[in-house]
Amino acid sequence: MYAVIRSGGKQYRVSEGDVLRVEKLPAEVGETVQFDDVLMVGSGSEVKIGTPHVEGGSVKAEVLEQDRHRKVEVTKFKRRQGYRRHHGHRQPYTQVKITGISAG
């Protein structure tokens, strides 16, 4: 069984046991989170497509890690002017493991 969920403005195709990184969620490591924004659920030849969500569909996941991605560095400069700017950014994420999918 698989599902397509929306989290943090992105869509993910997930199955039970999958480990994925989503935008930061307000949960502690070891807690269980539930994604109710299920767009599609499928198993074998049977597929349920939501309009826009599958009624009663939910995906449960366990939080494995709260961390930040590797640093993305941006440098801008103008030649011959002594103008240099350097900026770095690390986006926070939550790593989750899918524990259950319910079609509703």
Swiss-Prot record:
Known HAMAP family for this protein?
Ribosomal_bL21
NCBIfam families in UniProt: L21 (TIGR00061)
What SUPFAM superfamilies does the entry give? L21p-like
Q: Where is the composition biased (Basic residues)?
A: 81-90
A Gene Ontology cellular component where this protein is annotated is: cytoplasm
* Family, as annotated: Belongs to the bacterial ribosomal protein bL21 family.
State what this protein does: This protein binds to 23S rRNA in the presence of protein L20.
Single GO BP term:
translation
Q: Which domain of life, per UniProt?
A: Bacteria
Q: How does it assemble?
A: Part of the 50S ribosomal subunit. Contacts protein L20.
UniProt key word Ribosomal protein:
yes
Q: Which UniProt keywords apply?
A: Ribonucleoprotein, Ribosomal protein, RNA-binding, rRNA-binding
Protein name, per record: Large ribosomal subunit protein bL21
Region described as Disordered: spans on this chain:
81-104
MF terms in GO? rRNA binding; structural constituent of ribosome
Natural source organism:
Halorhodospira halophila (strain DSM 244 / SL1) (Ectothiorhodospira halophila (strain DSM 244 / SL1))
